[in-house]
């Protein structure tokens, strides 16, 4: 059976933390900033963790990620 391959699109979007959780960036950060409040833009800058509901599915795509 062939080797499992890491999903390259997901590998660019997620980083694994030291404890094994997955870190991701926020959506809504590419353009149209004039319509967003300062508070909203400030919160969107910070990375956040992947939710438990999505974690299992994303982990399968990133099985070989270091």
From Swiss-Prot:
- Disulfide bridge map: none
Listed InterPro entries: Ribosomal_bL35, Ribosomal_bL35-like, Ribosomal_bL35_CS, Ribosomal_bL35_sf
A single GO BP: translation
Q: Does the keyword Lipid metabolism apply?
A: no
The annotated region (Disordered) lies at: 1-29
Q: Which residues form a coiled coil?
A: none
What the entry lists under NCBIfam families is as follows: rpmI_bact
Q: What is this protein called?
A: Large ribosomal subunit protein bL35
Lineage of the species this protein comes from: Bacteria, Bacillati, Bacillota, Bacilli, Bacillales
